[in-house]
Amino acid sequence: MAFSWLSFVLLALPVLALARPSEHEARSLFCSTPSNIPFNDDKLPDPFKFNDGSPVRSFADWDCRRQQLSALIQGYEAGTLPPRPPVVTSTFTKSGTTGNLTVTAGFPGKTITFSSPITFPTGTAPFGGWPLVIAYGGVSIPIPDGIAVLTYDNSAMAEQNDQSSRGVGLFFDVYGANATASSMTAWVWGLSRIIDSLEVTPAAHINTAKIAVTGCSRNGKGALMAGAFEERIALTIPQESGSGGDTCWRLSKFEQDSGDVVQQATEIVQENVWFSTNFDNYVFNISLLPYDHHELAALVAPRPLISYENTDFEWLSPLSGFGCMTAAHTVWEAMGIPDKHGFVQVGNHSHCDFPSSLNPTLFAFFDKFLLGKEANTSIFETNGLFNGTEWVASQWINWTTPRFTLL
């Protein structure tokens, strides 16, 4: 008997009718990710709602919601993060405990080359290679024994001097000065090329499943964005990132309106090029943003994140940092892994100093998530010094945290 595509379709129709996918199954097959949507809310946006208002109930749902948030953050403030380009090659040299990774990336006929020094621990690398910390601009936190450190010259990838830095740097030599990517987005692109190269450089003896990223102040903002956008980062450690980092735009505006001298969106876009020019259109009406930075931080989940803030510096927006990370924490809670998200906020030290009293909190995250040791990482604390401004969670968080199902 002849068998045609038509007869196959006719035979299959009843089966297809019975196997109609559920709403959540359909979303997993097709996830709508616009870069701009209608929105207006003075409260922090609910991370457990899709763009269309339907609920996020499962890990499968979160995969889609994460894609939506990434697209929105790029569309409104970060600019477009390009994918891996067709050309990525590298060379590696090592002498003693000092190595050097040189990466060439771009398109045929238009490539850039940059180098990053790596400091290795003494001794023989463990099975799988050394864990690695990628430090934006240099290390400002203590690193435990047994972890290599790569110093990433992110400012060469995209300058961050002032407004004149727009479109200047190695990234823009590839994608053009008019690329929408902010400097921080360009930094993520460069970091990803480093990881690409390490993945195919066995001589470096780096365990690319155990990579952390860190930075302080402006570089702390960049470290958080790297952890959010680059899923190969195993541990994210922003330090005193302040406005544009682990604080929320809405909460920083509230602090400013309450009389605190903090850096909010209207000022930060005049200082530097950490955000895309499109963000200028929203800084005077933050309520139009369909996200806030609790959701930037939540892009890291389910991977671990611990951030550090300093209440001695009012302009870092201490209430905003605590409130924003309190809101972000609900995503790890929904996943049943709150111990993968930490926050520490104290004072009595200079900006970007790391007091030794904080070492146990930091080393706990290193031990558990990079070194494979047992450690208690249920760490979420503040000294509560918010310059007289009061944090009231119900004023900003109007959602009930779900418990995610698998599907």
From Swiss-Prot:
Main location: secreted
First-level EC class: hydrolase
Glycosylation sites: N100, N178, N285, N348, N376, N387, N398
Entry keyword annotation includes Lipid biosynthesis: no
Key word Glycoprotein present: yes
GO molecular function: carboxylic ester hydrolase activity
Residues annotated for substrate binding in this entry: K221, Q263, E271, W315
This protein's UniProt keywords: Disulfide bond, Glycoprotein, Hydrolase, Lignin degradation, Secreted, Serine esterase, Signal
Disulfide bonds: C31-C64, C216-C352, C248-C324
Gene Ontology biological-process entries: lignin catabolic process
Biophysicochemical property: temperature dependence: Optimum temperature is 45-55 degrees Celsius.
Catalytic function, reaction form: a 4-O-methyl-alpha-D-glucuronosyl ester derivative + H2O = 4-O-methyl-alpha-D-glucuronate derivative + an alcohol + H(+)
Gene Ontology cellular-component terms listed: extracellular region
InterPro entries registered for this protein in UniProt: AB_hydrolase_fold, GCE-like_dom
Pfam family, any one: GCE_fung
pH and activity: Optimum pH is 5.0-6.0.
Compartmental location: Secreted
Residues spanned by motif GXSYXG catalytic site motif: 215-220
Signal peptide (from-to): 1-19
Sequence similarity: Belongs to the carbohydrate esterase 15 (CE15) family.
Biological function: Glucuronoyl esterase which may play a significant role in biomass degradation, as it is considered to disconnect hemicellulose from lignin through the hydrolysis of the ester bond between 4-O-methyl-D-glucuronic acid residues of glucuronoxylans and aromatic alcohols of lignin.
Protein name, entry field: 4-O-methyl-glucuronoyl methylesterase 2
